[in-house]
Amino acid sequence: MSKQIMVGGVAVGGGAPVSIQSMCNTATENVEATVQQILRLEQAGCEIIRVAVPTEEAARAIPAIKARIHIPLVADIHFDYKLALLCAEGGIDKIRINPGNIGSKERVRAVADACRERGIPIRIGVNGGSLEKDLLAKYGGITAQALVDSAMGHVRLLNDCGFDDICISVKCSRVPVNMAAYQMLRAQTDYPLHLGVTEAGTPEMGVLKSAIGIGGLLCMGVGDTLRVSLTADPVEEVIAAKRILQAAGIRRSGPDLISCPTCGRTKYDMIPIAREVERRLHGCDKPITVAVMGCVVNGPGEASGADVGIAGGKGEGLLFAKGKILRKVPQEQLVDALFEEIDKL
């Protein structure tokens, strides 16, 4: 089991539930825009939120933002260690840095000391695009071993400063490399791991890459917190994260819709019905499994694990629950009958 750190009031690692993170795409110094985006993310289910801090103005906005939100706030720092110190003074809940890119060991120690005094954890955030030149030369490019060596070098740097309140990420945009790096890292350290596939792209491909790269690791028991990185509204990242956690069997946050791919036995126009059921399930928070099946011959049996479901036929279909047929229903009433049964659950 990994060690546990506290990011504000959210436990990460040590058997705590896998938490969902996102990152604002607003200018952090624009407090109003940033707060409004965070409030939308909270409503969607985000549990830890990160903001970029590239300037002193952004760092000084941290207290005003924290005062109006309800989830832990993380500062993303590159190069300027003084910005990390300002954020620590402003009450930040976690700092993300690469210790190797903020200067001398004295500067790293200053950040470590400021965080230790205030109980602020540090995430070592290694990205394939910013690997050290010597590691790129040693391994001939971005490899899993290069990512892990970079991360462990940063860990030693913080440990040498007497700092142990650490979370680690090793992200790149190539899913197999990403997964291998996290598996290697898990074998070498028990610090909590922040999962993600960086630069995953737009939702169409980015969600697929993240589902494989993050969901695959979660199914192997690797990972303590995650962010799905998408070129999109950050709320979409949170929705995707919840779906990945549900598909991996980690957390249920609503209904699970199962439906068959249809075949020659299907005697009704099932695809639009499945989509209508999916649409009407939005907003439902019941942790149930709902089935839409293509035929009355195999449907109820194949979906016997579903809490409730429908199977269509020619002109009429079946409403069933836990594999047992409840009644026949005219085809045009199937969806309404299904949701009447869902309301009873």
Where are these regions (language model features)?
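Glycine-enriched alpha-helix->loop->beta-strand junction motifs that scaffold or abut catalytic
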Residues: R68-I71, A88-I95, R116-G119, R186-P192, ...
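Active-site mouth loops of central-metabolism enzymes
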Residues: G15-A33, A52-P54, I71-F79, L135-V148, ...
